[in-house]
Amino acid sequence: YARMITGREYFGRRQGKVRACFDFQDFDWTGENWKKIPARDMILYQCHVRGFTKHKSSNVKNPGTFSGMEEKLSYLKDLGVNTLLLMPAYDFNECMHDENGVDLKKVNYWGYTEDAFYFAPKAGYAAKKGEQAKEFQKLIKAVHSQGMNVVMDFYFKDVSPEFMLTCMRYYALRFHIDGFRFNQECVSVEWLRQDPVLSHLKLFGYHWDECGYEAGQEMFCEMNDRFLVTARRFLKSDEGQVEDF
């Protein structure tokens, strides 16, 4: 699988051919201070890597990047947050297609698309071209040094359960990710429970009880984000939100 992508360095721009490239970089995790936070104590902050610091008010050196987010970790810690839930931070194609070809004005900002290279950190989130893996690792190390955890959100589409498990293991081992949110109905709970890597992480999903979940298992975390979604819509003045509130 492609672990680094070239040709998508500039977010929202079509830049010609997309190619896989070699990645021989090592990373020094010395001094990481990695601690696992119990699920019951997690205070999650869901964020988009680019959107979190892209506005000039963020006052970071490299807005809209992994490095930019690293600069704001102390701000998040002051809020009381101890776990980051990152919306897709792997490489996805944000340039959307329509029936007549490519509409350059349409951008899939959030990254929930099947047109993705799941094993490659997003090139468009790197401050320096070709450094996306290193900058992502640096971000994770800084998060852990703050006593916080990181959960990645994956939108797997039309891939096998084996692919999903392999992908999550890769990020857990190479990037020290603490957990994942994913469409868990595609994977056997027993596989997850017996996995030598994933069984030690936090796995977020909806309706684990329908997948064979048994109460009291620390690794399985139930997503309950209805208030989050309704509150956001209410603040945007969307119609019909008072009743939902």
Protein language model features and the residues they cover:
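Active-site-proximal helices and loops of the catalytic beta/alpha 8
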Residues: 106, 113, 167-169, 173-245
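Aromatic- and acidic-residue-enriched carbohydrate-binding clefts of CAZyme catalytic domains
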Residues: 58-65, 96-149, 156-177
